[in-house]
């Protein structure tokens, strides 16, 4: 759902990385792969090579600005990325911060209820029939539960106002102790 090229551009700042982006972009654009399997592999890598007891889990939402109406979950809503109401998709993301760096280790696309109820539109956007409406805090809880189940240790959890203000999210954290 998210453009690999845009993802690479956001983390690759030096001009010399353009060639690396093109090398990776071509085969990835044609390849069929399961994003959840890639996430699981990444989380396993974090557990084996990067995890620290003092790690920090960071949960936030981010906006992906869009021009059209066909992308999954797109609509006019507030985007922190733009700082105003824009046509965009919203993703809930979980990053892991450790002493040597950080990694984005999980994500879910927020699908507004109208998108979940309109199966024709959902089918056109290739949204699986198994998807159902979930609030952004519910998605954050899902990300946190998957991360804990993967065995990624963390001493701290930081969350944006939406997730951090959710009593079910805070109770999930309290019950982990």
Name what the model sees in each region:
Residues 1-157, 162-177:
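Conserved, well-structured functional cores that handle cations and Mg-NTP chemistry
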């Amino acid at each position: 759902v998210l453009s690999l090229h845009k993802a690479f551009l956001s983390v690759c700042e030096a001009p010399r990385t353009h060639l690396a982006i093109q090398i990776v972009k071509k085969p990835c654009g044609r390849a069929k792969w399961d994003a959840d399997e890639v996430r699981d592999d990444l989380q396993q890598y974090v557990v084996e090579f990067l995890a620290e007891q003092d790690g920090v889990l960071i949960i936030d939402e981010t906006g992906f600005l869009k021009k059209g109406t066909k992308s999954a979950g797109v609509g006019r809503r507030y985007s922190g990325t733009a700082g105003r109401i824009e046509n965009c998709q919203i993703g809930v993301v979980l990053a892991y911060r450790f002493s040597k760096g950080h990694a984005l280790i999980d994500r879910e696309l927020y699908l507004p209820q109208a998108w979940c109820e309109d199966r024709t539109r959902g089918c056109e956007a290739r949204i699986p029939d198994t998807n159902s409406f979930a609030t952004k805090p519910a998605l954050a809880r899902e990300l946190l539960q998957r991360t804990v189940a993967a065995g990624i240790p963390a001493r701290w959890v930081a969350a944006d106002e939406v997730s951090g203000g959710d009593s079910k999210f805070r109770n999930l954290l309290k019950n982990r102790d």
